[in-house]
Amino acid sequence: MELKNKVSNLPSKPGCYLYLNKDKHVIYVGKAKNLKKRVSSYFDRAQNLKTTRLVREIADLEYFVVSNEKESLLLEENLIKKYRPKYNVLLNDDKAYPYIIITNEKDPTYKYVRKLDKKAFRSFGPLPIGSNARETLITLQRLFPLRRCKGNLGKPCLHYFIGQCSGACFKEVNKEYYQEQIKRVDNFFKGNINEVKTLLTNQMHKAAENLQFEEAQRIKEQIISLDFTTTKQNVEFKSQTDVDVISYFIEDEKIAIVTLFYRSGKLLFKDEHIQLYFEQDITDLIDSFMSQIYDKNILPDKIIVDNEVELFDLNEKYKSISTHPIKEDEKIIYKLATENAQEAIRKSKISTTINIGNENELLLELQEKANLQKEPYRLEMFDISNIGNEFIVGSCVVYINGKPARNEFRKYNIESKFTSDYDRLKEMLYRRFQKALIEKRMLPDLIIMDGGIIQIHAAKEIINALGLSEIQVIGLVKDEHHNTSFLIDTNEEQVIIKDKPKLFNWLSSIQVRVDEYAKSGFRKKQNNSFLKSDLEQIEGLGKKRIQDLFKKFNTINEIESADQEELFKILKNKKALDNLNIYLKNRK
């Protein structure tokens, strides 16, 4: 049935609709109280005003009828997670922001989490990603000690001896002690950090007097790293409440959505999201954005959104806490959020102009240069990094519609006995695509191998064996200086790409990214290997327990900041844990 007839025959019932392009990729998922009315509005709007980018790409549609709006909301969220359409609001996995929590126990402890524990006694955050949140956790553990061991050990733990545990390991700790410590932590996160700075400064001077200069420098860096929570704000809320302010700015088929996170009236941090815009309903768009944010993060006391956003549906979902800017301070801060969204669009334009250009143009150029049968909406590039036969790590970077999809990047530990890159590549590619088939994940339109004919043949051997011969394969070859040189197309012929500067720079950036991603995995594996050798000297650990530690924790710093109960669950041996604690203490 033709698309026009499908639209005219849609039912006037609630449901979800999916738009597909000519390659049968789902490019947009939406929900509607009335399917016929909503879907028809897209095409009517396109004829009456202008043909939007989305409408130009729609080749087919599918739909699901549901009983009510609540069902359509849940279905829409699941379909977006499944297909990750390029025209929907798609937030990366890193939108699960870090939090520091205090557990709700008789003897509470601190924890650093990404997945919120709703049973926590206190939750502090969300904290900016890359904000030294773990350093802040260590600072709190040292200055305002709660329980830092399993508790009820019958004798003081190591952390108690160095003043970093409440003593729940060997004695009854009164409730008033914890109340006082938590009150001091509350004050710290409200921006009252004079006490913290004084304590740290005293520790720094003491370390310097004892000629412990490395320790003094580390404490100094801790003091500096606390600034992200306490920077003096030019604009603050008069009330001491938690407020999120969500604004947006639209220009040239792009929308920037900016969220300002205020905690206890002070701006904690700002988050930006930019994507394509095609005149979709702004309430639906903000609703979808909020669904993904608050699916993984704590709801504040209030959410302020634009006057254009209808509040009825939002307040049904978010407990009547959504509002338009009404008070004077709310209007001022909302204006600030809008200005930040405008600036995000401006920076995006500059970045696009300088670095690459229009992604669609690049994909079309690549299609032509590499002799591809279709435009590569999704491409995956593979590389391997190693020293001889040690620390072998494979990497895969994924680009969707010309942009990196970082949450889909993957590293592969290559443990096989093969000594040739050809066989190692085959192992990585087999694992990658066998799993994709089993889990019914989206497959790439194009595979780019970091290398030449040998690497291309390794890829073709695997995809043909798995019945995936429709996936196209090309190679990107480096020169003797390890810089991008030329492309090998689908006919396995060399193609010069330097005559297309934007395409060349873009492909070169992908090659650098996959190379660095592989090397980062290799370096981590190498460092962990050296560290594991060091840890093997600790009595009671052994290779198996060390492997178990590194399955749970990525670095020695994460092991150091873990609570004792968590470490004991892994080691299952008190003497091994005691020896590990002594090692961690002595390495500082």
Swiss-Prot record:
Alphabetical keyword list: Cytoplasm, DNA damage, DNA excision, DNA repair, Excision nuclease, SOS response
Domain GIY-YIG: 12-89
One GO location term (cellular component): cytoplasm
Record function comment: The UvrABC repair system catalyzes the recognition and processing of DNA lesions. UvrC both incises the 5' and 3' sides of the lesion. The N-terminal half is responsible for the 3' incision and the C-terminal half is responsible for the 5' incision.
Name this polypeptide is given: UvrABC system protein C
Every UVR domain range: 194-229
Assembly: Interacts with UvrB in an incision complex.
Alphabetized CDD domains for the sequence: GIY-YIG_UvrC_Cho
Subcellular location, record wording: Cytoplasm
Biological process according to GO: nucleotide-excision repair; SOS response
Gene3D superfamilies, alphabetized: 5' to 3' exonuclease, C-terminal subdomain, GIY-YIG endonuclease, UVR domain, UvrC, RNAse H endonuclease domain
